[in-house]
Design a protein with these regions (language model features):
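N-terminal targeting or regulatory segments adjacent to alpha/beta-hydrolase or S9 domains
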Residues: 11, 16, 24-94
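N-terminal export leaders
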Residues: 1, 5-10, 18
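Alpha/beta-hydrolase superfamily serine-hydrolase fold, recognizing
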Residues: 29, 53-75, 95-357
C-alpha cells in the first residue's frame, strides 16, 4: 500500500468511526429529523402536461386539510359521503359516455356489481374478466361513482370488467368489504377459470385486492392470474416513510392526519390495523399471482407500494413496479391524455395479455 493510499484509508477509517459514534446512541434523545422549509420545482423528467399542472397549482395546504377533522367525534361522515357521491356519479356518467362503455348493474350473492363492457373486446379477452375494486379510503366511491377507473380499464384494455360495489362504513366496517369481494369471486369461479380472472384497483381498491388474495389463500381458493395495484393503501398505520416525506407535497392525499387517519379507524372499527386483511403489507405473499404496480415520487403511498413490491420479490413473485416522476397519488387516473396515464393503462393491457390464460 502506497503512502497516499494509507493516508486515504486512515481518513476513511476515521470517518467511519465518527459515524459509528453518532449512531444510534447519540440520537437517543430524538429519533425524528426536522426538515427545513424547501422549494420544489416542477420535476424536469415528468411529462410536459404534468410539469405544467404542477407549476399552475398552489402547494397543498395541510392545515386546511386537517381543519374539518379537529373535532372527529362530531364529524358527519354521512354528509361528506353524500356530497362526494353526487360529484363522483356525475364524473362516472361523463366518462362512461365518452369512452363508449356499456354499464349494467346486477346482484351477485347479495352484492351489488356493475358490469362494464367496452365497445370492442380484445379477441384474447373474449372469455376473460377483470374484477375491479374501487378506491376511496374504504369510505367513498360507492354506487355508480366508483366505476370511473373500471370504465378506463374496460376501454383501454378492451376487457369486460366487473366492479364490486362492496359495503363500507359507517354502516359496514371491516370485514364487510373483504367478505363481499370473496363472495363475488367464489361466484365467478363457478363459471370462469381462475386463470381467466384479473383483480385490482387503485388506492384502497388496490389494498383491498391484496387483502382479498390473502383471504383467497386462507380459504384455499384458486388464485386469479394477474393483479393490478395502483398506489395501494397497504398499511393503514401511520408508519410508512412517504406519509411523512411527501406530506404537503402529494396534491391528492396531502396529509395522513385528518381524512386518511380518520377513515382508517372508521374502516377498521375495533380490529387491529396490522391485521393483514386490513393492512395487507403485513401478510404472507408467498404464492401470489404476478402483480402490476404503479406509484409516483410525490405519492404519499409510495412507501406502501415499495414495501409490498419488496415483500413480493422476497417471496419470489413476479412484480412489475412502475414509478412516475413527480406524480402524486393516482395522478394517472385524472388526466387520461397525459403520457403517465397512457403508459399506465397501455402497459396494464400488455400485462394482462401476458398473464391471463
Amino acid at each position: 500500500m502506497t503512502s497516499l493510499n494509507r493516508h486515504i484509508f486512515a481518513k476513511l477509517i476515521a470517518s467511519l468511526s465518527l459515524l459509528s459514534a453518532l449512531s444510534p446512541l447519540s440520537f437517543a434523545d430524538s429519533h425524528h429529523w426536522t426538515i427545513e422549509p424547501r422549494k420544489l420545482p416542477p420535476p424536469a423528467a415528468a411529462s410536459a402536461q404534468l410539469r405544467q399542472s404542477i407549476a399552475s397549482t398552489a402547494a397543498p395546504d395541510v392545515a386546511m386539510r386537517l381543519l374539518p377533522f379537529k373535532d372527529s367525534a362530531a364529524f358527519d361522515w354521512n354528509s361528506l359521503i353524500a356530497q362526494r357521491s353526487a360529484t363522483d356519479d356525475e364524473t362516472a356518467e361523463r366518462l362512461v359516455s365518452a369512452l363508449n362503455v356499456t354499464v349494467s348493474q346486477q346482484m351477485i350473492e347479495g352484492v351489488s356489481v356493475y358490469q362494464l363492457t367496452p365497445e370492442q373486446l380484445d379477441p384474447q379477452f373474449n372469455h376473460r374478466v377483470f374484477l375491479y375494486l374501487h378506491g376511496g379510503a374504504y369510505v367513498f366511491g360507492g354506487g355508480l361513482g366508483g366505476i370511473s377507473e373500471a370504465a378506463i380499464i374496460a376501454n383501454t384494455a378492451n376487457i369486460r370488467v366487473l366492479s364490486v360495489d362492496y359495503r363500507m362504513p359507517p354502516g359496514h366496517p371491516f370485514p364487510a368489504a373483504v367478505d363481499d369481494v370473496v363472495a363475488v369471486y367464489k361466484h365467478l369461479l363457478k363459471s370462469t377459470p381462475a386463470g381467466a380472472i384479473a383483480i385490482g384497483g387503485t388506492s384502497a381498491g388496490a389494498g383491498l385486492a391484496l387483502s382479498s388474495i390473502h383471504k383467497f389463500k386462507a380459504e384455499n381458493l384458486q388464485l386469479p392470474a394477474a393483479v393490478y395495484t395502483g398506489t395501494p393503501w397497504a398499511d393503514l398505520t401511520k408508519t410508512s416513510d412517504s406519509l411523512y416525506t411527501n406530506e404537503g407535497i402529494d396534491r391528492v392525499l396531502v396529509a395522513y392526519d385528518g381524512l386518511l387517519g380518520a377513515a382508517a379507524l372508521l374502516y377498521a372499527d375495533d380490529a387491529d390495523l396490522k391485521d393483514p386483511l386490513i393492512s395487507p403489507v403485513y401478510g404472507d405473499f408467498s404464492g401470489f399471482p404476478p402483480v402490476y404496480m404503479i406509484t409516483g415520487t410525490r405519492d404519499m403511498l409510495l412507501s406502501d407500494t415499495a414495501s409490498v413490491h419488496r415483500k413480493l420479490r422476497i417471496a419470489g413473485v413476479a412484480a412489475d413496479l412502475n414509478i412516475y416522476e413527480g406524480m402524486s397519488h393516482a395522478g394517472y387516473a385524472f388526466n387520461l391524455a397525459s403520457p403517465e396515464s397512457q403508459q399506465t393503462y397501455g402497459e396494464m393491457r400488455a400485462f394482462l395479455r401476458r398473464y391471463l390464460q
